[in-house]
Amino acid sequence: MSDHVFVYFRVPEALATEALPHWHRWMETVAEATGIGGTLMRRPETRAGVQTWMECYADVPPAFDATLAGLWRQSGLEQWVDGERQVEHFIDLDML
């Protein structure tokens, strides 16, 4: 079964340009630690001065969440996030 992880969070629009290079480094850190390269996306619209960003990781192993959480605790990136990061799992229907 192919497990995909989507992590979404809010970034204040006023900080988005400054936050972006930090997130590129974060994605590199995750790839180096897990061997899984992710994709960084955002909603096209901004609501109430906040953008919604999302990290997407495909074909992750069961231990991925724990590794990602540990890396996040060490990252220092909380300053760029408005609220909590939400982690969601999806599976390919073709694999059922």
Question: Model-predicted segments: where are they?
Answer:
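Short S/T/G/P-rich N-terminal loop/turn motif that feeds into the first structured element of a domain
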Residues: 1-69, 88-96
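A common structural junction motif
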Residues: 27-31, 72-81
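Acidic/histidine-enriched active-site and ligand-binding environments that engage anionic O-linkages
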Residues: 77-91
